[in-house]
Regions:
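Long, contiguous interaction/recruitment modules in multidomain scaffold/adaptor proteins
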Residues: 1-37
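TPR/TPR-like (Sel1-like) alpha-helical repeat modules
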Residues: 118-141, 148-155
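Alpha-solenoid helical repeat scaffolds
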Residues: 11, 31, 37-47, 138, ...
């Protein structure tokens, strides 16, 4: 009798978990029981590939991470950075969109999305992202280098305008 109860309880738990996943209530990471620490270890591997110019390998890792933890902003930012390095600006922008959707104060993603927008010919949306960085700056003093980068890019774009 006890074995049957265990099987019924396990079945109900599995059904609950799958239902939660299918309805977006839990992530694949949670469904699989992968810890945040394990995810960050995989992220570090992807980051190392990225640092050494192994962009396709890094892209595979970051794509997997975003599938397993779609609400983790820095995984999306990393995927955006890889796509930006590969000059796939459409995919980079989409990944940065997800990063910003998950963290509306992600100054770094705004800078990189702005760059990608400008590089893909969407200058006005790119400038808007860079201006957003300046709006967020007072609340994020730790983002000084990104604010400086946004200011520099805005000045460069301003200097390209006809007089």
């Amino acid at each position: 009798m006890q074995r049957q109860e265990i099987e019924e309880t396990s079945g109900k738990y599995l059904e609950f978990m799958v239902h939660g996943f299918m309805n977006g209530l839990i992530t694949l990471q949670e469904l699989e029981g992968i810890s945040d620490e394990e995810m960050e270890t995989v992220y570090a591997l992807g980051y190392n590939f990225f640092t050494y110019g192994k962009y396709e390998a890094a892209k595979d890792i970051f794509t997997g991470l975003t599938a397993y933890a779609p609400y983790t902003s820095h995984y999306w930012r990393a995927l955006g950075a890889v796509n930006q390095q590969l000059k796939d600006y459409t995919e980079a922008i989409a990944a940065y969109d997800m990063a910003v959707a998950n963290d509306e104060n992600d100054v770094v993603s705004y800078v990189y999305r702005g760059e990608s927008q400008i590089l893909s010919g969407n200058v006005d949306p790119g400038l808007n992202d860079l201006k957003k960085v300046l709006e967020l700056a007072p609340a994020h003093p730790e983002a000084g280098q990104w604010v400086q980068r946004a200011e520099l890019l805005l000045k460069l774009q301003e200097s390209k305008k006809p007089a």
